[in-house]
Amino acid sequence: MSISRLTFSFDSSGWLYVYHLGVAHYLQRHVLPHLEAERVAFSGSSGGALVAAALAGGIDIEQLAHHVIGCHGRCRFNPFRMLPAAEEAIAKYMPPDGHLMANGRLRVLLTRVRLAWMRPLFGPEAVSEFASVAHLRQVLRASCHIPVLGGVLPYQVDHIGTSRARGASRGYDAGYYDGVFWPSVLYMWRAFDASDTLFKVSGLGWPTAHIRPPLPLPLHWVCLPPPPTTLWRLFAAGYDDAARRLHGEGGGRALPDGVRAALPPPPPAHAAPMPVWLIALGWAHLLLLTCLFPLVPPYLACRELLQLQGRGDSKTAVLLRRGLLLAPLLAIWPLVLAYLVTRWACGRVLRELIALHDEGQAHATATSTRDAARREAKRI
């Protein structure tokens, strides 16, 4: 017989999982010590799966946050380094018995790739049983496997345990992509049982989440992290938002009386660490990147080249410098293509208009000639 549990579910987030870490830090300090382990569960997708696994495995969240934000320097202008940084964190902090603590308490959302007749190519899958700590690491890495940034081919997971949640796979050596944003209405992946009390956490600010930023955060922060000071503001915002939600009437009723009484007073609303102007500045940055999209790849490549030269990595810098010779051509071709298509379309429209004008002129001339001939005939 299944027991009703308190389940915290973390959405896909990319670098915005720093907000998730702030929420997790509050839970680890003020909520989880007052709950029995079998009464609480976690679920997550992509970066949210890493945070959920950290809570299930008893990892020090504050120490993990310092490591994650410390990777900002090498990942700021190179989104391809985001997943190697995640692999490094998983290998460094996941305890040897992490799979034992996660079994039955952690659900990880994946996107399975199937090549079969009369079956969809992509589909959601939730994994909650882990054969070993290596298997747990593979599942977490697969849930973060963003296409292109992590590779074109799906990430291979060697083994899926025989005891699985509903909807899990039945095979070996399966290929997976990032868990992305599978709606809970289509696939019930967040909780273990329908009787569970669910708290949804979203770093992107989805309106259906229980704990979320007050305003939607800029989307490019998912792959291109903001400065470390802004990341620490995100961490503090997650901590404060969790405190306000769980201490309020909406979230407090879901907690046992002893847990709610032990919670510290939430911070005042006016002490929010994420000012509106900072979020607005991020959205303005995203708008600028969107307008100047053809110039973004060479810009990021130049910044990466400067960092490589600063670290003395001359061999990689030479390769990147040669690649920059082709980068402007690759970046300008969308503008050239748009210009050619627009010119062709406008030229065709102009030719049609000119033809219609000439036809109208000819028709008017013919009509006036006929009218003149009729008047001349009547006069005769």
List PLM regions with ranges.
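Gly/Ala-rich beta-loop-alpha elbow adjacent to hydrolase catalytic centers
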Residues: 44, 48
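Patatin-like phospholipase
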Residues: 1-43, 53-380
